[in-house]
Amino acid sequence: MPELVWLNPHDTVFPPTTSALEDPNGLLAVGGDLSPARLIAAYKKGIFPWFDDSQPILWWSPDPRMVLLPQNLHLGKTLKKLAKKQAFKITIDTHFSDVMQGCAQPRADQDGTWITTDMENAYLELHKLGYAHSIEAWQDGELVGGLYGIAINRVFYGESMFSKVSGASKIAFANLATQLASWGFYAIDCQVATEYLASFGAAEMPRVEFEQILQQSLQSQPPKCQIEGWQNSWNMPDYGQLF
């Protein structure tokens, strides 16, 4: 039976993902830190941190993995109707910290939040370095929804989303997926299965297949947005794609 590995605080090496536990699914390692170098090394291998204030840093690589191929984005009739109403203005990388704080707010079905202050600070640093990005949904000048994640070459690793108004995060996500498809991204990592993500066309795949996509991404030419910047390359209409 695989044993849980405590990370060496002096390097950013992770154990093979094949050594991750089956129960809980994907728990791979404990400890380390949330430095940019360690986080980037983790995401390149499909590993992500997920823990709360009462726990040490926990690192995960679940099998199977929930993934959306951007070209497979599915939009239901209700979402298409909402998009055509142009109810939300969509922006990119204008209020990263506010989006994280929105995602960190307690939810009705949760006792607390896994987006701790340390996590906020770590991802804000990744945002400053050009790896972490936010997509914002606005209504009447108020931030009412959005999401954030990490982009490394041609894979976007989704982290969390929030909505204060019904449909806000869905419109933000749909526009992100549409833009990523046009930029030639290979995949959007959704981590673990939910009905919400499945409604967009995301599906589970074996971890080994997901890791093959990661390797293809790392070996490919950087996308336009990485070279020119996300804000400079973003070409969705102000009120989103009408689909």
Curated annotation (Swiss-Prot):
Subcellular location: Cytoplasm
GO molecular function, one term: leucyl-tRNA--protein transferase activity
GO BP annotations, alphabetical order: protein catabolic process
Catalysed reactions, semicolon-separated: N-terminal L-lysyl-[protein] + L-leucyl-tRNA(Leu) = N-terminal L-leucyl-L-lysyl-[protein] + tRNA(Leu) + H(+); N-terminal L-arginyl-[protein] + L-leucyl-tRNA(Leu) = N-terminal L-leucyl-L-arginyl-[protein] + tRNA(Leu) + H(+); L-phenylalanyl-tRNA(Phe) + an N-terminal L-alpha-aminoacyl-[protein] = an N-terminal L-phenylalanyl-L-alpha-aminoacyl-[protein] + tRNA(Phe)
Listed InterPro entries: Acyl_CoA_acyltransferase, Leu/Phe-tRNA_Trfase, Leu/Phe-tRNA_Trfase_C, Leu/Phe-tRNA_Trfase_N
SUPFAM superfamilies: Acyl-CoA N-acyltransferases (Nat)
Keyword field: Acyltransferase, Cytoplasm, Transferase
Organism field: Saccharophagus degradans (strain 2-40 / ATCC 43961 / DSM 17024)
HAMAP family: Leu_Phe_trans
The UniProt record lists the keyword Cell cycle: no
PANTHER family: LEUCYL/PHENYLALANYL-TRNA--PROTEIN TRANSFERASE, LEUCYL_PHENYLALANYL-TRNA--PROTEIN TRANSFERASE
UniProt family annotation: Belongs to the L/F-transferase family.
One Gene Ontology CC term in the entry: cytoplasm
Documented EC number(s): 2.3.2.6
Described purpose of this protein according to its UniProt entry: Functions in the N-end rule pathway of protein degradation where it conjugates Leu, Phe and, less efficiently, Met from aminoacyl-tRNAs to the N-termini of proteins containing an N-terminal arginine or lysine.
Protein name: Leucyl/phenylalanyl-tRNA--protein transferase
Principal location: cytoplasm
EC top class named in words: transferase
